[in-house]
Amino acid sequence: MVRGRTELKRIENPTSRQVTFSKRRNGLLKKAFELSVLCDAEVALIVFSPRGRLYEFASAPSLQKTIDRYKAYTKDHVNNKTIQQDIQQVKDDTLGLAKKLEALDESRRKILGENLEGCSIEELRGLEMKLEKSLHNIRLKKTELLERQIAKLKEKERTLLKDNENLRGKHRNLEAAALVANHMTTTTAPAAWPRDVPMTSSTAGAADAMDVETDLYIGLPGTERSSNRSETG
């Protein structure tokens, strides 16, 4: 008669649960001891009861030694596993990039009109649409650049016209200043007898009057003439 398999589930009765824990715990500790002795294995066992009481077993001189060994092993294993995962990820990324580059190169060749022998009508239509879209974008960019250049040239033209107007204003100011200076020089120059006017008795007197020498004399009245006569004598 085959014995039925007992379903494992939590024991609801606290007393029964505590009795079962004590029996199973002792059996587990015994099995751990037998495993370490029979197989020369380093075994460590840590058990906490439902009430929080600690039970432990270690085949090594101390449980901490086994725990430290476990930490060192898991650390090295995790690091090695991480490195292997990183290497595999790099390989996968490299392979994916190589496939993308190959596809891009193939697409470039087809756009340039190369390797079209194996293309279907749908593929050729798709290439045609891509080319038309590319040409449209190129024309838009070209128009944008031309508009920018025209705007810069117009701005430069406005600047040059403004500078030219400023220079004309300065030139007009210089001409006006030169005319004023010439007029002032003409009006302040000494008068000379015109060569075309004939010399008559009246004009001769006027000419003599222009040639009269004047002397400044300081002294008593009546002494000026005597002084002049003595000088001429």
Curated annotation (Swiss-Prot):
PROSITE patterns: K_BOX, MADS_BOX_1, MADS_BOX_2. It comes from the Eukaryota. Gene3D superfamilies: Transcription factor, MADS-box. CDD domains: MADS_MEF2_like. One of its GO terms (cellular component) is nucleus. Residues 1-61 form the MADS-box domain. Its main location: nucleus. Keywords: DNA-binding, Nucleus, Transcription, Transcription regulation. SMART domains: MADS. The keyword Transcription regulation applies. The keyword Transcription applies. GO terms for molecular function: DNA-binding transcription factor activity; protein dimerization activity; RNA polymerase II transcription regulatory region sequence-specific DNA binding. It is found in: Nucleus. InterPro entries: MADS-box/MEF2_TF (IPR050142), MEF2-like_N (IPR033896), TF_Kbox (IPR002487), TF_MADSbox (IPR002100), TF_MADSbox_sf (IPR036879). Residues 87-177 form the K-box domain. GO terms for biological process: positive regulation of transcription by RNA polymerase II. Probable transcription factor. This is MADS-box transcription factor 56. The lineage of its organism: Eukaryota, Viridiplantae, Streptophyta, Embryophyta, Tracheophyta. The gene is MADS56.
